[in-house]
C-alpha cells in the first residue's frame, strides 16, 4: 500500500541521517509476554524516558518462515497448509502454552541473536503459564547476566494496574536495581486521565 512506502521512506531517511530516537541508547531489550491492551505507548516511552530500545516483541515472533506471496495454483493449495501451521503456532498457544522450549529457551536464543542485555517481561496477572515459570526465568536470566524486569498488568482492565502503575514498575527497577536516572525526567510520570 502507498502508506507503507511513505513510512518506509521516512524510516530510510532517518536511518541515512543516523537520527536517533532518544539522546542516548542504554539498553537493548527483548519484550516478552503479552502486553496490556490499554498501554500501547510503553515501548516508545521506554526509549525516551530510560534509553531502553525494544528490539522485538514476543507478539511479532509468530512466524520466522516464508509463506507464499505469489498467486499460483500450487501456492493456493499451500495456503491451506500455511494457515493451518499459523493457527497451530499462534502466540498464546505457541509461546505461553507451547512448552518450555518455545517459552523459555527461545527467549534466550533471541537475546543472544539480538545482543539484548535486558528483557521486559509482561506478566499478565491471570496468566498461569508465565507465573508458573517465574523462577525459571529469574534463574536463567541471572546465569546469563541479563536484566529481567517483571511488569505486572491486567490484560484488558486499566483499573487494576493503571498506565502509570505499569510505568512505575519500570521506573522503580531502573532507579533501584540499575541505579540510573531517566534521560527525560519530565516524562517519568505522565497524566493519563485523558488516555482512553
Q: Where are these predicted regions, by residue range?
A:
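Cap/lid and interdomain-hinge subdomains that line or gate substrate/regulatory clefts
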Residues: 1-21, 175-196
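Domain-level signal for soluble alpha/beta catalytic cores
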Residues: 22, 28-30, 60-68, 165-168, ...
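Hydrophobic alpha/beta core scaffold segments
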Residues: 47-51, 71, 75-78, 91, ...
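Conserved N-terminal ligand/cofactor-binding loop architecture of enzyme catalytic domains
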Residues: 57, 62-89
Amino acid at each position: 500500500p502507498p502508506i507503507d512506502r511513505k513510512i518506509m521512506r521516512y524510516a530510510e531517511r532517518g536511518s541515512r541521517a543516523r537520527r536517533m530516537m532518544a539522546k542516548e541508547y542504554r539498553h537493548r531489550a527483548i519484550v516478552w509476554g503479552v502486553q496490556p491492551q490499554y498501554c500501547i505507548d510503553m515501548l516508545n516511552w521506554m526509549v525516551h524516558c530510560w534509553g531502553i530500545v525494544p528490539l522485538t516483541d514476543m507478539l511479532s515472533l509468530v512466524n520466522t518462515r516464508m509463506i507464499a506471496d505469489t498467486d499460483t495454483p500450487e501456492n493456493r493449495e499451500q495456503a491451506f497448509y500455511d494457515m493451518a501451521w499459523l493457527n497451530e503456532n499462534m502466540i498464546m498457544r505457541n509461546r505461553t502454552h507451547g512448552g518450555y522450549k518455545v517459552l523459555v529457551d527461545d527467549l534466550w536464543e533471541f537475546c543472544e541473536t539480538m545482543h539484548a542485555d535486558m528483557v521486559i517481561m509482561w506478566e499478565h496477572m491471570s496468566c498461569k503459564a508465565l507465573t508458573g515459570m517465574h523462577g525459571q526465568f529469574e534463574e536463567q536470566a541471572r546465569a546469563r547476566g541479563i536484566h529481567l524486569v517483571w511488569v505486572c498488568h491486567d490484560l484488558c482492565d486499566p483499573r487494576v494496574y493503571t498506565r502509570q502503575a505499569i510505568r512505575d514498575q519500570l521506573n522503580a527497577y531502573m532507579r533501584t536495581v540499575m541505579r540510573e536516572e531517566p534521560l527525560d525526567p519530565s516524562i517519568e510520570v505522565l497524566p493519563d486521565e485523558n488516555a482512553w
